[in-house]
From Swiss-Prot:
It comes from Bos taurus. This is Serine/threonine-protein kinase 33. Keywords: ATP-binding, Cytoplasm, Kinase, Nucleotide-binding, Phosphoprotein, Serine/threonine-protein kinase, Transferase. ATP binds at residues 122-130, 145. Residues 116-381 form the Protein kinase domain. One of its GO terms (molecular function) is protein serine/threonine kinase activity. It catalyses: L-seryl-[protein] + ATP = O-phospho-L-seryl-[protein] + ADP + H(+); L-threonyl-[protein] + ATP = O-phospho-L-threonyl-[protein] + ADP + H(+).
């Protein structure tokens, strides 16, 4: 790798290909001054070698102006002063699967002033800040995250490096885009996509809460991003309103806000190695968004992100968190119980289907929690439902019937009205096998296929055979439900 110190090792001039003079100014015989930003390397999408660049200060100029070292006069620049050469050594930290992100190593950050015009501060932390910047050559706006590695400490720097590695490896319309990285011995600069509308949390605070349709669009985008990450075995682990940025927004004809969101801040994100069953153990995240299994310090998987999506959706709909308490200890107790309430009057205008989605997202047991992919296919999210959603599995139907038997009685009344008086009076007894509700011809047909197949008396459809789960409901493929004795 080329030495970044011009005084110690000669390099080739990008203009004339001759060796530069061995002096502090690093001036070539063709009178071109070389930049202190002498080595630029590209993080690769595979394990192949990287590319090194030697960059002159004229590589980027505002409106194409450059300065001659000897005359001091400005002269137009017509070409990019970059020389590429192969390298056997790769400076990147790992192999990536999505596009190339330049990772530029410098002696100091002064060279950035040649590339960007810095503007307002967008955010500030204990050891870094985010600044709006304009690329002088392309006249494009970016958000540059500047981190002081010395103040951050080794542990925080490791998290930052992991964040950079993950951002280099992803490409999705609803995940923040990393354009390039500049790094000095003391600082790191992440040039990222600028989201001019700010944090989703700020917009929520101004609105109070979002409508159901507005929330649906946000959750669609969020679910798409998380499904993409989970498919790549990446777990975000810190999903919250503050970590969802808004690139742009508009008000549609129905006076509803449409937001183009971007998931950001991958400081706690981790890429799992191995099969999807691999579990995580580190307790991390923001308390009100943390899943029960994370609080319990149990092994957990990417399903912790799904719980966080549920919390976000709940807050978007009503403006308040699902669980609130006077102390963190009490808050964690509420989260571990996972009892959702919809007592606020706002919930009167929210569909039962949306509430059902919330319940599926916030199952205390992660094994029963809906996945990101399943969420994308959910009828409420796709907009393919016009009525209240009903549970899709036997266990959920059992719970619904126990909590609200009146609703089930209403649904079965219509079914009984369509049957004969004799069929209305039938009482079905629970059994590990499907109750005998078919005639002899049905039984003979079942014997032919070697199992106890039955037929629905309502629509003559096939009934799922030999269910191993003791239940109060039987589900037919025609979506008819028959209540049996408890």
């Amino acid at each position: 790798m080329a030495d970044s110190s011009c005084g110690k090792k000669s390099t080739k001039c990008p203009h004339c290909s001759s060796a530069s003079q061995k002096n502090a100014l690093c001036i070539c015989s063709c009178k071109t001054k070389l930049s202190p930003m002498s080595v630029v390397e590209m993080s690769q999408t595979s394990s192949t070698g990287s590319s090194e660049f030697i960059v002159s200060p004229e590589k980027r100029k505002e409106k194409g102006a450059s300065k001659d070292v000897t005359s001091g006069k400005d002269s137009p620049s017509k070409s990019s002063n970059i020389e590429r050469k192969p390298s056997q050594q790769q400076w990147g930290r790992g192999n990536f699967t999505e596009g190339k992100v330049p990772h530029i190593r410098m002696d100091n950050g002064a060279a950035l002033q040649e590339i960007y015009t810095f503007g307002r501060i967008l955010g500030q932390g204990s050891f870094g800040m985010v600044i709006e910047a304009i690329d002088k050559e392309r006249e494009t706006k970016w958000a540059i995250k500047k981190v002081n590695k010395e103040k951050a400490g080794s542990s925080a720097v490791k998290l930052l490096e992991r964040e950079v590695d993950i951002l280099k490896s992803v490409k999705h319309e609803h995940i923040i885009h990393l354009e390039q990285v500049f790094e000095t011995p003391k600082k790191m600069y992440l040039v990222m996509e600028l989201c001019e509308d700010g944090e989703l949390k700020e917009i929520l605070e101004r609105k109070g809460h979002f409508s159901e349709n507005e929330t649906r669009w946000i959750i669609q985008s969020l679910a798409s991003a998380i499904a993409y990450l989970h498919n790549k075995d990446i777990v975000h682990r810190d999903l919250k309103l503050e970590n969802i940025m808004v690139k742009s927004s508009f008000i549609d004809a129905n006076n509803e806000m449409n937001l183009n969101i971007k998931v950001t801040d991958f400081g706690l994100a981790v890429k799992k190695h191995g099969r999807s069953e691999v579990m995580l153990q580190t307790t991390c995240g923001t308390p009100i968004y943390m899943a029960p299994e994370v609080i319990n310090a149990h092994d957990y998987s990417q399903q912790c992100d799904i719980w966080s999506i549920g919390v976000i959706m709940y807050i978007l709909l009503c403006g308040k968190a699902p669980f609130m308490a006077s102390s963190e200890e009490k808050l964690f107790e509420l989260i571990k119980k996972g009892e959702l309430h919809f007592k606020n009057s706002i919930w009167n205008s929210i569909s039962d289907c949306a509430k059902s989605v919330l319940k599926q997202l916030m199952k205390v047991d992660p094994a029963h929690r809906i996945t990101a992919k399943e969420l994308l296919d959910n009828q409420w999210l796709t907009g393919n439902t016009v009525s209240s959603a009903r549970p899709t599995n036997v266990l959920e139907m059992m719970k619904e019937w126990k909590n609200n038997p009146e609703s089930d009685e209403e649904s079965t009344t219509d079914q009984r009205d369509s049957r004969s008086g004799q069929e209305e009076s039938k009482v079905y007894q629970p059994s590990r096998n499907v109750p005998d509700v078919s005639n002899s011809s049905d039984e003979e047909e079942g014997k032919q296929v070697g199992r106890t197949n039955k037929t629905c008396r309502k629509n003559n459809c096939f009934i799922s055979p030999n269910c191993e789960i003791p239940s109060q409901h039987l589900e037919h493929f025609c979506n008819s439900f028959f209540v049996v004795g408890l």
